[in-house]
Amino acid sequence: MNWITNYVRPKINSILRRREIPDNLWIKDPTSGEMVFHKDLEVNQYVIPNSGYHMRISAKNRLMHFFDDGIYTPLENPKVVIDPLKFRDEKRYIDRLKDYRSKLGVDDNILSAQGTIEGLPIVATVQDFAFMGGSLGMASGEAIIKAFDTAIANKCPLVLFSASGGARMQEGTLSLMQMPRTTVAIEMMKEAKLPYIVVLTNPTTGGVTASYAMLGDIHIAEPGAMIGFAGPRVIQQTIRETLPEGFQSSEYLLEHGMIDMVVSRLEMKATIARLLRLIMKCPPAVNPSNPSPTDSQPPLSKAEAA
């Protein structure tokens, strides 16, 4: 009886017990409601195969897919004074920073790296919206300036992926100062006659739009990205008029001449490499590398997903 109670019954219960399924195995498409397996989404660079909806992607994942074979050398971000204003809203700013750093494993929202795309050496800088909404503060400003300095020192182009809600209110004027400081870095880049390409991702707003995000030589946007200075509701309340449908979307801005092109994330690497070769008068790549480091798992097309 003890053998049945202590061994057989627990064994049967463990077999029959329903296995718990992790919450993140299936991702829901916000536009169509379609459920997509998370592995398929990772391979497809977080672009929904059927609808083409571009979900947010982490800075590390973006760089992995962007650089040749997923290989790059991260740049160490400069150290800055933490919470110089001793700011507090619902919680202390320094505690808010600690929470984000513990959750995401990064110091701030900027990740810069050196590597190659189709053999071309470049510096890439990515803003991660997951860290305090990609807000521009002293740390992110210093990191962006260092990326420009590195590109100039190595005589190579810089590609910046913007994703931000604007200036970081917890740092006040110190945050706003990063707008002219990054603008000066861009002028130094232009004086060095080096290309600076901006990729506007969802969302790019506020002080970031009013500074380095709109000062590139070429402006590319991902499909469906929200791009603007103030939000639609603020503008409507100010001008007392109804805004056009799709106002501040990347497609609307392209139609009205505010950006140069709208490019799918799946085609971004090849497009930027082609543009850089034209600008820098480099010969075309003989064997362009796969945009994904996993050559055995190419991005899913709409037909394959169906």
UniProtKB/Swiss-Prot annotation:
For this protein, the Enzyme Commission number is 2.1.3.15
Has UniProt tagged this entry with the keyword Cytoplasm? yes
Domain CoA carboxyltransferase N-terminal as annotated: residue spans = 25-294
Name the residues that span the membrane.
Answer: none
> Which segments carry the region annotation Disordered?
286-306
- Write out the GO biological process terms: fatty acid biosynthetic process; malonyl-CoA biosynthetic process
Q: Which family does it belong to?
A: Belongs to the AccD/PCCB family.
Put simply, this protein is called Acetyl-coenzyme A carboxylase carboxyl transferase subunit beta
From which organism does this entry originate? Bartonella quintana (strain Toulouse)
